[in-house]
Each structure stands twice: as C-alpha cells, then as structure tokens.
Amino acid sequence: MTEVAGRPGTSGGLALRAGQFVFAAASICAMASAPGFTNYTAFCYLVASMGLQALWSLGLGCLDYYALTLRRDLQQALLMSLFVVGDCVTAILSFAAACSAAGVVVLFERDAYLCRRDPQLPCGRFEVAAAFAFLCWTFSAASALVMSWLLASL
C-alpha cells in the first residue's frame, strides 16, 4: 500500500507539486495581466487562492526534492496528517475559487453579454485564468487523494 504513485519524497510526488505550482502561477499571471480584475471579488479570491496553492505546492515540492536528494522517507504519521489537511484545504479552496471565477465569466459572456458590450473587458484572460485554476485543482485533488490513501494505509 505504501508504493502509491505520487507519494511524498518521490519523483511522482514532485511532479504533482510542480504541476500544482505551474498552473497556480499561470492562473495568477493570466489574471494579473487582465486590467480591472480587482473590481470583481471572485477574481480577487481566485488570485488569493492560487497564491496560497502556489506557496503550499512550492514548499512541499522543495521538501520532495530534499527527500529525493538525500533519500529520506517522508512517510511518517505526523507528516502525512499535515500533508492530508493541507492538501484537502488547498484543493477545496482552489475548486471554490475556480468555480466562482468561471461562474462570473459565464455571467459576463452568456447571461449579461458584458463582453460584447464592453470590448475593454478582458474576458478572454478571465477565461484562461479560470481554466488554469481548474487544471491546478486537478493536480491538487489528485495529491489530496494520494495523501488520504497513504494516511489510511499507515
């Protein structure tokens, strides 16, 4: 049971963390390049959530790299408990932020037609940021699932 792909201290775990970080950073960059995103709460929440996700995944990615370099085992009950809680919290926050941002984008484009009426509104960038947030969430959810599975098998 302990040989699950993506467990901490392995190259699979490092790849999951790298994917989380890359897509969170891409979402932040896409949103930050959109002028006026601070006028909408859902987009500010997306940036805050992706910032937290990027910091969490960067920290655990560094820990995975350290464990890989020194061949350390990170499967200890206390560490796994912290990983599970952190991964579950960041996965839930990422999903909520991605859904809220995507909901506002749908409102702008399909319901209120604000994107057609106001060509200055960067709807395409909002869409890209929400899409990257969903991709970040998929990596985060996979990591949370792996960590929960590993904690249950200890």
From Swiss-Prot:
Source domain of life: Eukaryota
Topology, Cytoplasmic side: 1-17, 64-87, 152-154
UniProt feature coiled coil, ranges: none
Residues listed as glycosylation sites in the UniProt record: 39
Record keyword Metal-binding present: no
Subcellular location: Cell membrane
UniProt keywords, alphabetically: Cell membrane, Glycoprotein, Membrane, Transmembrane, Transmembrane helix
Keyword Ribonucleoprotein belongs to the record: no
Subunit structure: Homodimer and heterodimers.
Protein family (similarity comment): Belongs to the Casparian strip membrane proteins (CASP) family.
Protein name: CASP-like protein 5B1
Protein's organism: Zea mays
